[in-house]
Structures are given as C-alpha cells and as structure tokens.
Curated annotation (Swiss-Prot):
Pfam families hit by this protein: SAICAR_synt
Organism: Mesorhizobium japonicum (strain LMG 29417 / CECT 9101 / MAFF 303099) (Mesorhizobium loti (strain MAFF 303099))
Pathway(s) per entry: Purine metabolism; IMP biosynthesis via de novo pathway; 5-amino-1-(5-phospho-D-ribosyl)imidazole-4-carboxamide from 5-amino-1-(5-phospho-D-ribosyl)imidazole-4-carboxylate: step 1/2
Class in the EC hierarchy, top level: ligase
Enzyme Commission identifier(s): 6.3.2.6
Protein name: Phosphoribosylaminoimidazole-succinocarboxamide synthase 1
Gene of this entry: purC1
Reactions mediated catalytically: 5-amino-1-(5-phospho-D-ribosyl)imidazole-4-carboxylate + L-aspartate + ATP = (2S)-2-[5-amino-1-(5-phospho-beta-D-ribosyl)imidazole-4-carboxamido]succinate + ADP + phosphate + 2 H(+)
PANTHER family: MULTIFUNCTIONAL PROTEIN ADE2, SI:DKEY-6E2.2
Amino acid sequence: MKNRRRIYEGKAKILYEGPEPGTLIQFFKDDATAFNKKKHEVVDGKGVLNNRISEHIFNHLNRMGIPTHFIRRLNMREQLIKEVEIIPLEVVVRNVAAGSLSKRLGIEEGTVLPRSIIEFYYKADALDDPMVSEEHITAFGWASPQEIDDVMALAIRVNDFLSGLFMGVGIQLVDFKIECGRLFEGDMMRIVVADEISPDSCRLWDVATQDKLDKDRFRRDMGGLVEAYQEVARRLGIMNENEPPRPTGPVLVASTDVVKGKPH
C-alpha cells in the first residue's frame, strides 16, 4: 500500500485511491487545526478517535436510510468510502448559540435557539470560508436549487439523529458541520453525506457540567483534547469501559478484540 496514489490532502485527512473503481481510502491524521490552519498542532491519537467515532455515526446513518459515502472502516486510521463530487460548501446546523454565531449576532453563548438554523459557508481557505446565502450558491453554480433542498433535508435528518444520539449519553449537540457530495451511480445521481462527523466537526457539551468535549478545547487552549474525545467515544460505547486512558494513545474496542491505537 506504500505506492498507492494520493488523491487529496486536507487539514485532517488524506484521500488515497481505493481498491476498486469509485472508491477511495480516507486516512485520519493526528493534525489539529483551527482558524484555517493559522493554529496547528499534532495531537497523538486524535485521528484514531475521529475515525472510530465517525464510523460509528455513519454506520447509524446508513442503517437509517440517510445516504452517506461511508462503506466500512479498514483499520484504526482508515475508512473505505465511495468517491463523490464534493459540493464546495460547509453546511452548519446550529441548535445552541456558540462560536461565530454568538459573536456575529451578540447572542450569549449557550442560548438555546428558537429553532435549528442552517448556514452555508463557501469552502475556500484563502477567504476564511465566508458565509454565503442560497442566492450565492445558485448564482455561482455551486449547487442547484434542488440540490440545496436535498442538502438541507439531509442536514435536518442528521441533526435529528445526532441530537438524540448524544442526548442519550448526556451530551448536548450545540452545532455541527457536514459536507455533502454528488454520488454518481450509472445514470443516477444523488446527494449524500460525506467527509466525517466527529468531535472535530461538532460542538459537544456535557449536559451536567457544560464541559466542552470537542475541538473548542484546542481552539481556546483549554487542553485535554484527546481526553475529551475519549470521553465521547466511551459514552458512545466505542471505547473499552474498563480500560483507563493511556498516554500512548486511546484504547478502543474493535468487534470483540481490544486493539491499541498507534500513531502512524
């Protein structure tokens, strides 16, 4: 596999050519970035945790009939995914005021919003991913009106599922980001959820303590990033309950075997 062709490298993942046509291998890196890579560190074990948490969530979405690019996890850091044409938008769903929304509109962080709000951001690091409207999206041809409707419908379904999943383990889903892509199957095309869903792309607060269990720990120099991600994995039933966190990386449950996450 050393000679496999690299298709794309982003801030937190690498895409490689897959074993079959129409597939890719998604590799999760340990890089932690914020503010479009203005802040960057390597955090041992983060990629392993994001791979496992994202696998857990995407498996649930697939079983519920919410279409995604996910096929299966290959190992501790890699997933087999369907190749899609990514729509150049970050789709953000907000349930509670936090981050840029609080700053932009002067709403106190932690305020529950009157209803879930969907926002679109154009994927362009050089421009700091500017917020855009549906008018921008259709005018510049990033997506058609029907595709926007499909993306929004997916975002609402994902939000409903994730809110229940996390609330069931004592975590409040404050907001999250997804990306969507066009999956071509013969003469058919459909919009599917792509990228990842993990504490890197969600704001997750402990219901009882309001502790942050997401990438805000890195953005705000709070420390304890891996420990927070481990706690999310533990509550979701991914981590072995009886295994204490170790400095060399998280210990995770894969099927019936306990395997140790090692940095690549």
